[in-house]
Amino acid sequence: MRSAFLIPLLLTASMASSTASAEDFPADRVVAAAAGDWDKDGTPDLALVVRPTDESDVDNGLYIYLHKTNEARLELAASLPNTLWGSMMMSGQEPELVAMANGSLQVITKNETIGRERWRQTLTVAYRNFDFIVAGYTFSGYDTVEMDENGENRTKSCDLNVLTGKGKADDKPVTAKAAFVLLTDWDDAIGQKACGYSR
């Protein structure tokens, strides 16, 4: 959704309270934000990626807020600290959030600059039955050392509908068990296994 919504949403999020496990954090630790209508009630909601403190070695946190209808505030609906890999110190490793027109949220992690394996992963998160689930999993990557039979970097590419268990990996159909996986229960190994990869 339009970035003009982000400033007031960030301000109201800083005052949000919920039964979810809330964590207080200053605005300068917010490294990615997206506004969209996650629950499709016609009001803008918010998602944030928050980096850990400088003294911590844990991963980034993901926090998703829902707008309280008829109230001028956001409520924390999902709190996932130590969830998203990524670094703001190195270009090409920053986590990203993208609000989709259909109300879904894309959560992107990547390593596009360092090491032998370069990759990009996208979780498509949807709001269903009053909770957030992982509806889709997309992964692409390449090996900077290993070559294929054509002398090009060996690549991987997978697009999976988690809800149906159907997708494609390296241009071949793949079928996994259809699953309704809550975002809080998601492990990247679920998608990697379905695609026939390991990382």
PLM features: what roles do these ranges have?
Residues 40-51, 98-110:
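Acidic/hydrophobic-patterned starts of short beta strands in beta-sheet-rich repeat architectures
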Residues 29-40, 90-104:
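Beta-propeller blade termini
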Residues 20-28, 70-92, 178-182:
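Blade-edge motifs of beta-propeller repeat domains
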Residues 102-199:
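Acidic, small-residue rich beta-repeat scaffolds with periodic aromatic anchors
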Residues 56-79, 125-129:
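Beta-propeller blade repeat segments, especially FG-GAP/WD-type strand-to-loop junctions
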Residues 1-7:
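Bacterial N-terminal signal peptides that target proteins for export
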